[in-house]
Amino acid sequence: MSLKYSSTTADYLIWSDAMNLIRKLAKDENYKISLLIALGCFTGLRISDILSLRWKQILDADEFTVIEKKTGKVRTIRLNPQLQQHIKECYEHINPIGINAPILISQKGTIFTVQRINIILKEVKKKYKLKIKNFSCHSLRKTFGRQVYNMNSDNAELALVKLMELFNHSSVAITKRYLGLRQEEILQTYDCLSF
């Protein structure tokens, strides 16, 4: 986590790069991290909420409910068929101790920490030569947000309102800043000038 008002912030992955990464990790038999990235990109959950998930919540489920650790709010998440299939494949390869087990357990038998996940993601960035400056747990949530926004560009304001509610932001302006849209809009101002 960065200090408030500091310039370091997580970046998002281009959606196609994120999907390719999920597939490559699974192909390389790194099912836990493949699952982590898939859940982050497809649900927009914070890492603290992903780490608290148990197999019984997500395996063979169309949707599941979480109580967000940061806000205490109840949130229902729908899982699309492709993600459901990926969850099932990861479950079969990970072979956890049971359906009640947390989905992301380290080799030591403990739930991964946020700090450890961030270290792993930096290693993944290097190994797979990802074109992203600051890759961290939060990048997954931002990747989700950017994809939702991009897929609804014909009705961008509605997409931003939906994302504002999903992210529990107090305003659309905060959501725009969170997704890096405000900075992009400012930089595009320079592009409209001609010589």
List the model feature ranges, each with a label.
Residues 2, 13-43, 154-155:
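Basic, Lys/Arg- and aromatic-enriched nucleic-acid-binding interface segment
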